[in-house]
């Protein structure tokens, strides 16, 4: 269409130029009007063109059906060893096993001689026990009850240092928890010629709440002197035993002798 319009314009221009120059149409311009022909036959199929650019991503399709279960895979590598579990509860005792075979016959016993030897050994043990008790009482200065042993340490120390000294010997500061033990300790320091010693009672953790050196609470027994404990000057958190058997709260930084206590099972 555009080509036809261009040819018609060219023909019109030639006519104008011819009129201006007063020349004949044949002399001025020779015009040929081209008319489009009929549509030709379809040509042969051309070669395959180059691949086009990728198109836009289409919309997400619907979720497909679940596929068939695959075959079991091979055994994988061993994983790392996990943490050790907590200890389980103790199991029930097993059934009693069958009796074992009888042993070989023993050597005939000469019982009369053995009984005599055992009797002599019992006498020696009794004698040695009495001698040991005498040595502990007379030489080492130890006092005993059925369950406890007490040692008077004639070294002046502050309360906490005295407690450490007793612990270093395998015991603790003495803790009289009944009248008998308290009377024994009072007689002990009287015989030693002392007026007072540290014992294992204090209220270091909470004022007025006296406990024993092993932190067990005091029960019903106590031997406080009249007007004690009074926490004079707000610094009396430790306890002394005087020769009369009474207790008095004193400052822990004072130095004095002290009594250690030991369990017989651990001596």
UniProtKB/Swiss-Prot annotation:
Q: Where does Ca(2+) 2 bind?
A: 228, 230, 236, 248-249
Q: Where, in this chain's numbering, is Ca(2+) 1 bound?
A: 203, 207, 231, 236-237
Instruction: Please name the gene that encodes this protein.
Output: COLEC11
- What does the sequence similarity comment in the record state about its family? Belongs to the COLEC10/COLEC11 family.
Coiled-coil stretches: 110-144
What name does UniProt use for this protein? Collectin-11
SMART domains linked = CLECT
Molecular function terms from GO: calcium ion binding; calcium-dependent carbohydrate binding; D-mannose binding; DNA binding; fucose binding; identical protein binding; oligosaccharide binding
* Assembly and oligomerization: Homotrimer; disulfide-linked. Interacts with MASP1; probably triggers the lectin pathway of complement.
Q: Which residues form the C-type lectin domain?
A: 145-261
Residues covered by region (Disordered): 40-109
Which residues does the record give as Ca(2+) 3 binding sites? 207, 234, 237
Which InterPro entries does the record associate with it?
C-type_lectin-like, C-type_lectin-like/link_sf, C-type_lectin_CS, Ca-dependent_lectin, Collagen, Collectin_CTLD, CTDL_fold
- Location(s) in or outside the cell: Secreted
Under the heading PANTHER family, the entry gives:
COLLECTIN-11, PULMONARY SURFACTANT-ASSOCIATED PROTEIN A
Write the signal peptide boundaries.
Answer: 1-21
| Record-annotated disulphide pairs | 166-260, 238-252
Residue intervals passing through the bilayer = none
Its predominant location is secreted
One GO biological process this protein is involved in is: antimicrobial humoral response
* Compositional bias of kind Basic and acidic residues: 41-50, 62-71
What positions does the domain Collagen-like occupy?
Answer: 49-108
The residues the record assigns to binding a carbohydrate are: 196, 236, 240, 248-250
* GO CC terms in record: collagen trimer; extracellular space
Q: Which organism is it from?
A: Bos taurus
Q: Which purpose does this protein serve, as stated in its record?
A: Lectin that plays a role in innate immunity, apoptosis and embryogenesis. Calcium-dependent lectin that binds self and non-self glycoproteins presenting high mannose oligosaccharides with at least one terminal alpha-1,2-linked mannose epitope. Primarily recognizes the terminal disaccharide of the glycan. Also recognizes a subset of fucosylated glycans and lipopolysaccharides. Plays a role in innate immunity through its ability to bind non-self sugars presented by microorganisms and to activate the complement through the recruitment of MAPS1.
């Amino acid at each position: 269409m555009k080509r036809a319009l261009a040819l018609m314009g060219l023909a019109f221009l030639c006519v104008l130029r011819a009129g201006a120059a007063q020349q004949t149409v044949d002399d001025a311009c020779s015009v040929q009007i081209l008319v489009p022909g009929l549509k030709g036959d379809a040509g042969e199929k051309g070669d395959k063109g180059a691949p086009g650019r990728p198109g836009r991503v289409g919309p997400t399709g619907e979720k497909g059906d679940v596929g068939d279960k695959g075959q079991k895979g091979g055994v994988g590598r061993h994983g790392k060893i996990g943490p050790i579990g907590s200890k389980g509860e103790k199991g029930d005792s097993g059934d009693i096993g069958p009796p074992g075979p009888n042993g070989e016959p023993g050597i005939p016993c000469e019982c009369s001689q053995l009984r005599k030897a055992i009797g002599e050994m019992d006498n020696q043990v009794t004698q040695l026990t009495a001698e040991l008790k005498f040595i502990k009482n007379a030489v080492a200065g130890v006092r005993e009850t059925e369950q406890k042993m007490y040692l008077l340490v004639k070294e002046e120390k502050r309360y906490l240092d005295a407690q450490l000294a007793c612990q270093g010997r395998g015991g603790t500061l003495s803790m009289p928890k009944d009248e008998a033990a308290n009377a024994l300790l009072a007689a002990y320091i009287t015989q030693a010629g002392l007026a007072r010693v540290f014992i294992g009672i204090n209220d270091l953790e909470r004022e007025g709440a006296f406990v024993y050196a092993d932190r067990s609470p005091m029960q019903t027994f106590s031997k406080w002197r009249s007007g004690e404990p009074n926490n004079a000057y707000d610094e009396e958190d430790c306890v002394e035993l005087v020769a009369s058997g009474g207790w008095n709260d004193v400052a822990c930084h004072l130095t004095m002798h002290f009594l250690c206590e030991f369990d017989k099972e651990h001596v």
